[in-house]
Each structure stands twice: as structure tokens, then as C-alpha cells.
Amino acid sequence: LRTILEFLNTHEYMYEHLMLKGGTAINLTVFNLPRLSVDIDLDFVPNLTREETIDERVRLTEILKKYMSEQGYSLSETSRFSHSLDAFHYNYVNAAGNRDMIKIEINYSLRTHVFSSEDRLVVTDAFGEPIKVRTVAAMEIFAAKTNALISRAAARDLYDFCNMADMKLFSDAENMFRKCIIFYATISANKVNKNFDTSAIDSIAFSKIKSDLFPVLAVRDKFNLEGKKHQAKE
């Protein structure tokens, strides 16, 4: 994970065209790796014409595939390439000698962001020497995370959201954070949840916490699911 992120942020072309977002950005650059997240979710940055974007997409794909192949990763047949999303699934053998997979997703549909990008330090000591990565602004990442929690209600979304609330990350900019949530709600769903109905959060079962969250937590503290649900809905 470190070597790939380092490549994406030291290769001039890749750095200029991509920004990290999602759970990996949250748990590497905002929090000190309380939960493991290795999927690399990226936004394509330049706001170009359709034709220009197609050309840049081809070049970007060639650079990424060449690098990953040189590093010993093999592209899986489970990879998906759609209208505006490229999902590269790479197989590799990990340090324990087991087969593993890392996912790199590049979204080409969101090329205009609310805030400028941020160069953020990876805060965990697990990477050794600190590196900087270009990310979507933290407020935007959590606005998208909030909408994901409301819509798909995944255990990891609840965990990340409640960590944000516990740390009061945007307590001095709550109005702007709400605007960002509305912005991402309008662009990320086929049907906008105008009432911001949070009832889907109630569907998160403790079995999902045990299967999807506990295995990737650095420290498995007692998890008060009902308390976390209430906190998120408030």
C-alpha cells in the first residue's frame, strides 16, 4: 500500500491527475489507523472535455498498469471498467506467502470539487518514514462518507462517522459541512434522499460488526452498536 501511494504521489503525471479519498484517506491521514483500509479510491481531477478526458484516461491507465506489472501485481479478471469508473483488482502474494488482492478505483465522473485538494501526511507509524499524499479535502471525504452511511449503512461507515463525531472534526464549520453533505447527496444517488432519512442505519446488525469491522480494527474495544447508531442519527 505504501509503495503504491508513494508512486501515485511522486510520479508527476499521476500526482497532477489524481486525489485519494474514502476510507483509506480517512484512516491514514486523519486518524492513526484505527481500522485497516487498503482499497485505494481516487478521483480524477482535471475538469476537461469528454474527448480530453478519454485521452487522459488511456494514458493514466497505461502508466498504472505498467507500474503495477513491474511491481509483480497481476490484474484480476474481476476488474471492472464502466462509463466513469475504472476498478482495477490486483492479485499479489503478501508477506505471509498468501494470495491477496488490492483494489484501485478511479472515478472520472466527479471532476469539480468543493474545496482544493490537500497534501496530507500519513500519520500512522506503520509506514515508517512519513509520506505525503494528495487527497480530497477532509470535509468532502466525510461528507461523502455521511451519505454512504445513510444510503448503504455499512459497518465501516458507521465506525468512521462516529470517530469523526467523537473528535469534533468540523465543530467550528458545521454549516459548511452540512452544505457539503447536501452537495454529495445530489451527485451520488439516482434519487436524492431529500429528508435525509437515517432509518437505514437501524438495519446494521451486530453480526456485520463482527464480520466486517472487528477483523480490521487495530484495537477491538467494546462496540456499543446501539449507542453508535443513536450518535450517528443525532
Give the role of each language-model region:
Residues L1-L18, L28-I40, F44-E234:
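Structured mid-to-C-terminal alpha-helical surface segments
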Residues G23:
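Active-site glycine-centered loops adjacent to acidic/histidine catalytic or metal-binding residues
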